[in-house]
């Protein structure tokens, strides 16, 4: 099965290079891209990005930059220098911060997708209320996603439950990256707003993020292939 633009992103939630690369060597770059988050990047540094790219995988650098505009702009530029496929910032950092990130990429012929994080999938309405945010998670996602589009982001990270409304209000070209995806053979773990791969694609998600159902599987490649099969069912409309 050869997918030139894989919609599946596997989260590499490891703390050592050895354990990470052991898993990566079992995966297929025609079926997925790979996400490097804070734990792995802090433990291993930029070299882990290069090692994974050498193995043929596109990299989503998931560091969720959130700082003053100048600092975020420099961080995004550094990510572009690494040649990553996707990088993200927190929409709650504001329009000026996101615009600075966009401007930092102007000199690059091949730019990473610049994505904004809205509301983390682990957050419930009650969690937001505890932070002083009185609207629901879905309403907060709508607010932040609209701000992200205004600030020229390529898309947002959001729960699959919000995708239909976001696509309707922000347009089909605005990318939706959805964590909280659990294949039919896996449990819910610690994320509260979840969907299966088939459900998420039918809702309009552009890229799906999956972690433990693959990384902790007895046979990671088989798990990856099972998820790819679920995704194929969505494209067939069955």
Curated annotation (Swiss-Prot):
User: Which pathway?
Assistant: Pyrimidine metabolism; UMP biosynthesis via de novo pathway; UMP from orotate: step 2/2
Q: Name one GO molecular function term.
A: orotidine-5'-phosphate decarboxylase activity
Enzyme Commission number, as recorded: 4.1.1.23
The signal peptide stretch is none
Q: Name one GO biological process term.
A: 'de novo' pyrimidine nucleobase biosynthetic process
Q: What InterPro entries does the database record attribute to this sequence?
A: Aldolase_TIM, OMPdecase, OMPdecase_AS, OMPdecase_bac, OMPdeCOase_dom, RibuloseP-bd_barrel
Q: Which UniProt keywords apply?
A: Decarboxylase, Lyase, Pyrimidine biosynthesis
Q: Which GO terms describe its cellular component?
A: cytosol
**Residues at the catalytic site:** 64 (proton donor)
Keyword flag Lipid metabolism: no
Entry binding sites for substrate: 13, 35, 62-71, 121, 182, 191, 211-212
Instruction: Tell me what reaction this enzyme catalyses.
Output: orotidine 5'-phosphate + H(+) = UMP + CO2
The organism's superkingdom is given as Bacteria
The protein's role, per its UniProt record: Catalyzes the decarboxylation of orotidine 5'-monophosphate (OMP) to uridine 5'-monophosphate (UMP).
- PANTHER family according to UniProt: OROTIDINE 5'-PHOSPHATE DECARBOXYLASE
Q: Assembly and partners?
A: Homodimer.
Which NCBIfam families does the record match to this protein? PRK00230.1 (NF001273), PRK13813.1 (NF010386), pyrF (TIGR01740)
Q: Give the similarity note.
A: Belongs to the OMP decarboxylase family. Type 1 subfamily.
This chain belongs to the protein called Orotidine 5'-phosphate decarboxylase
């Amino acid at each position: 099965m050869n997918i030139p633009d894989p919609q599946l992103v596997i989260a590499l939630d490891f703390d050592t290079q050895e354990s990470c690369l052991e898993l990566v060597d079992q995966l297929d770059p025609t079926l997925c891209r790979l996400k490097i988050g804070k734990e792995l990047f802090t433990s291993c540094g930029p070299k882990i990005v290069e090692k994974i790219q050498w193995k043929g995988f596109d990299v989503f650098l998931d560091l969720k930059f959130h700082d003053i505009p100048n600092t975020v702009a420099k961080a995004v530029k550094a990510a572009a220098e690494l040649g990553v496929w996707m990088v993200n910032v927190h929409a709650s950092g504001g329009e000026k911060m996101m615009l600075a990130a966009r401007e930092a990429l102007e000199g690059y012929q091949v730019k990473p997708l610049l994505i904004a994080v809205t509301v983390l999938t682990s957050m419930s309405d009650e969690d937001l209320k505890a932070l002083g945010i009185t609207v629901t998670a879905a309403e907060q996602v709508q607010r932040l996603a609209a701000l992200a589009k205004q600030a020229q982001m390529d898309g947002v990270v959001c729960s699959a439950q919000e995708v239909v409304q976001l696509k309707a209000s922000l347009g089909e070209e605005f990318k939706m990256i959805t964590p909280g995806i659990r294949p039919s053979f896996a449990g819910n773990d610690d994320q509260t707003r979840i969907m299966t791969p088939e459900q998420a694609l039918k809702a309009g998600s552009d890229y799906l993020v999956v972690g433990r159902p693959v990384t902790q599987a007895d046979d990671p490649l088989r798990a990856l292939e099972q998820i790819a099969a679920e995704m194929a069912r969505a494209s067939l409309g069955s």
